[in-house]
A protein has these predicted regions:
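N-terminal signal peptide c-region/cleavage motif recognized by signal peptidases
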Residues: 13-15
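A beta-strand edge to alpha-helix "cap/lid" segment located at domain peripheries
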Residues: 4-7, 19-45, 50-127
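Acidic/polar active-site rim loop that often engages polyanionic ligands
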Residues: 10
């Protein structure tokens, strides 16, 4: 079984993850789905123990603090929509780049949409 680390914006793990562009894209889209669903067990499963996650604000989280922020509602995503995505795979390293439109919800229920560029670096490693 393989574990996938995403550095830069994220570290995550995906079992049986093939090292090609299409599966790299699927892994990224699955991560977005789990984040929007506030699926804490799903986040626990897909995020690597060495997660480094940088928010658009510059705030940095590790795995535990990121999952806690989702659980508390501090990080609350209503929708994550890729506008552009490009995948590159170099041996055991995969890079996703692109532009996202993210609909966020604040604790008071107000919603804002942010548009941002992202880079996620995936490194394939044994589990």
């Amino acid at each position: 079984m393989k574990k996938l680390l995403i550095l830069g914006c994220l570290l995550a793990s995906f079992a049986g993850f093939a090292q090609n562009e299409e599966s790299l894209k699927e892994a990224e889209l699955n991560r977005f789905k789990v984040m929007v669903a506030k699926d804490l067990p799903g986040l626990q499963a897909v995020l690597h123990k060495d997660l480094v996650y940088f928010h658009s604000s510059g705030v940095q989280d590790n795995k535990d603090s990121y999952i806690a922020s989702v659980a508390s509602g501090k990080s609350s995503y209503v929708a994550i929509t890729p506008e552009e995505m490009q995948q590159r795979v170099y041996g055991k390293t995969g890079i996703n780049t692109g532009i996202l439109s993210i609909l966020q919800q604040a604790a008071d229920g107000s919603q804002t949409t942010i548009r941002l560029r992202f880079t996620d670096v995936f490194v394939y490693a044994d589990k």
